Amino acid sequence: MKAHLVDCNYEEQSVTYRFETQKWQINERGGIHGGAIAGMFDTAFGVVANLTAGDNEATTTDMTISFLRGVELGMEVDLKVYIVKAGRSLIRQRGELYDAATKKLLATGSGSWMPL
């Protein structure tokens, strides 16, 4: 997955990553496979959780994705991740996936990560 950091907002406790969709991610209908979209969320959530965990690593304990619109090949998408709560035993996050060009909301997600 090709991703790069777009924004980091301390006050919002948010981080935004831009992903470029790739040919290997397409499904039989020609759109981006839901598993690839879930992978974008898990990647972005994981980076933020590991940074939040400090000296510890963090692992995914649960994650939920809601697919709202299709994602097409060649589309650049922005995934904005928010830290909902960072405790000692769990880091809770939520995220929103947008079309980078139109700013339309494509998917939402949430999940928890456990510092090890």
Q: Which functions belong to the PLM regions below?
A:
Residues F19-T21, F67, P115:
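Hydrophobic residues in beta-strands and at strand termini
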Residues I32-D55:
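Active-site helix/loop of acyl-thioester processing domains in fatty-acid/polyketide metabolism
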Residues V47-V77:
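Hydrophobic beta-strand-centered segment that forms part of the acyl-chain substrate-binding groove
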Residues M1, E11-V15, T59-M63, M75-V77, ...:
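A generic structural signal for short beta-strands and their flanking turns/coil linkers
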Residues T16-R18, K80, R94:
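Beta-strand residues in well-ordered beta-sheet regions across diverse protein folds
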Residues L5-D7, T60, I83:
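A structural signal for short, hydrophobic beta-strand segments that form beta-sheets
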Residues V71-L73, Y82-L116:
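HotDog/MaoC-like acyl-thioester-processing domains
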Residues M1-I32:
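Catalytic strand-loop segment that frames the active site of acyl-thioester-processing enzymes
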